[in-house]
Swiss-Prot record:
Is synthesized initially as an inactive proenzyme, which is activated by self-cleavage at a specific serine bond to produce a beta-subunit with a hydroxyl group at its C-terminus and an alpha-subunit with a pyruvoyl group at its N-terminus. This is Aspartate 1-decarboxylase. The active site is at 25 (schiff-base intermediate with substrate), 58 (proton donor). The keyword Transcription regulation does not apply. It catalyses: L-aspartate + H(+) = beta-alanine + CO2. Pathway: Cofactor biosynthesis; (R)-pantothenate biosynthesis; beta-alanine from L-aspartate: step 1/1. Pfam families: Asp_decarbox (PF02261).
Length: 127
């Protein structure tokens, strides 16, 4: 049996662009993708801490070191520049893989630079 677990998370990212007329997806600084192991075209879930919106889309690479977080296409209607978001990717794991699974979590600052890397999420933690 496979179970679905979070494998990567960009926490407290800030939206830098919203492009309604792009075909779709979310553009993410390639350095951030690499830091947590999200691949180009991988399915991601994006939640908006300002308005509660939650969407699923796929990641595309943005310029390295740019800090870009750009919601493209219809998602641009739910995300504004400056909104704080959480970007998560999931993996399907076997029971054997679950025992050793460690998600990668990057906590970002207001410029979308990595402030802290976590190997686990601690219950009731406020960052």
């Amino acid at each position: 049996m496979l179970r679905t677990f979070m494998h990567a998370k960009l926490h407290k990212a800030r939206v830098t662009e919203a492009n309604l007329h792009y075909v779709g997806s979310i553009t993410i600084d390639e350095d951030l993708l690499d830091a947590v192991g999200i691949l180009e075209n991988e399915k991601v879930q994006v939640t908006n801490n300002q308005n509660g919106a939650r969407i699923e889309t796929y990641a595309i690479k943005g310029a390295r070191g740019s800090g870009v977080i750009c919601l493209n296409g219809a998602a641009a209607r739910h995300f504004q520049i400056g909104d704080e978001v959480i970007i998560m990717a999931y993996a399907q794991l076997t029971n054997e893989e679950i025992a050793t699974h460690v998600p990668k979590v990057a906590v970002l600052d207001q410029e979308n630079s990595i402030k802290q890397m976590l190997s686990q999420e601690i219950a009731h933690t406020i960052l």
